[in-house]
């Protein structure tokens, strides 16, 4: 894959083979920005997990203390009082069968879909449409719930979902390059603590194999996992 001049120049700013203390790695990530826009700061945790094992296939959600810098569009499938709560929480779209019908016609003008348990039987028919896009509501991520007021508020306040991929990685957006380093650090530590809290008991050996941080289109910088817990 051919790399641009800015990408190649950013590689000269750090040692790709070295692991850096958390604070220094965050600083380097901001310095090595390649994109001309306010790029996202992303991290990847490579975990000693087998996604084929049910108890090790991690999936969940958490609220980052400083959000991600991105305002997400939220659609809510609910009726009656719960629909009113969704509107109160400033969900972008609220409906029931009317929204399901729109989605069935390939309407996806939202980032997160929240549904009450009552709506799931009708929505489950659209699994083939929503599943591949990562939009199917799931109890593990808090998007299937009767408390739609709280669900929408959390999403609007910086809640992110995480899921182990086929290679054993958890990818997450920590914020924007414009964020203070302290905010990025606290967001990353929050994710780290969450991953430690849900560590499967069946894990043998080192749980966190490696951690990298980067900005959009920029090279990854390795973080010393030990410095995250300090």
Swiss-Prot record:
Pfam families in the record, alphabetically? Ribosomal_L1
* One function term, GO molecular function aspect: rRNA binding
Record's GO cellular component terms? large ribosomal subunit
Superkingdom of source: Bacteria
Asked whether the UniProt record includes rRNA-binding among its keywords, one would answer yes
Q: Which UniProt keywords apply?
A: Repressor, Ribonucleoprotein, Ribosomal protein, RNA-binding, rRNA-binding, Translation regulation, tRNA-binding
Q: Does the keyword Chaperone apply?
A: no
Kindly state a single biological-process term from the GO annotations of this entry. Answer: translation
**Which N-terminal residues, if any, form the signal peptide?**
none
Q: Which SUPFAM superfamilies match?
A: Ribosomal protein L1
Task performed by this protein: Binds directly to 23S rRNA. The L1 stalk is quite mobile in the ribosome, and is involved in E site tRNA release. Protein L1 is also a translational repressor protein, it controls the translation of the L11 operon by binding to its mRNA.
Record's subunit section: Part of the 50S ribosomal subunit.
Similarity comment: Belongs to the universal ribosomal protein uL1 family.
Name of the protein in question: Large ribosomal subunit protein uL1
Q: Which organism is it from?
A: Onion yellows phytoplasma (strain OY-M)
């Amino acid at each position: 894959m051919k790399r641009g001049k800015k990408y190649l120049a950013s590689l000269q700013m750090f040692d790709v083979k070295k692991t850096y203390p958390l604070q220094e790695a965050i600083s380097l990530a901001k310095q090595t920005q390649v994109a001309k826009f306010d790029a996202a700061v992303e991290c990847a945790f490579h975990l000693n997990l087998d996604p084929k094992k049910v108890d090790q296939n991690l999936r969940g959600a958490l609220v980052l203390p400083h959000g991600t810098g991105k305002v997400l569009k939220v659609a809510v499938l609910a009726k009656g009082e719960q629909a009113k709560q969704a509107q109160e929480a400033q969900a972008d779209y609220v409906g029931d069968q009317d929204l399901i019908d729109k989605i069935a016609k390939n309407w996806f003008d939202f980032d997160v879909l929240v549904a009450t348990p009552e709506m799931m039987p009708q929505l489950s028919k659209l699994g083939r449409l929503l599943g591949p896009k990562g939009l199917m509501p799931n109890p593990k991520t808090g998007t299937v719930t009767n408390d739609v007021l709280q669900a929408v508020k959390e999403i609007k306040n910086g809640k992110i979902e995480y899921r182990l991929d086929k290679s054993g990685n958890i990818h997450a957006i920590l914020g924007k390059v414009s964020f203070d380093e302290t905010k990025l650090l606290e967001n990353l530590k929050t994710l780290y603590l969450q991953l430690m809290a849900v560590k499967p008991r069946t894990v043998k050996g080192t749980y966190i194999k490696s951690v990298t941080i980067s900005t959009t289109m920029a090279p990854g910088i390795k973080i010393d996992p030990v410095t995250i817990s300090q």
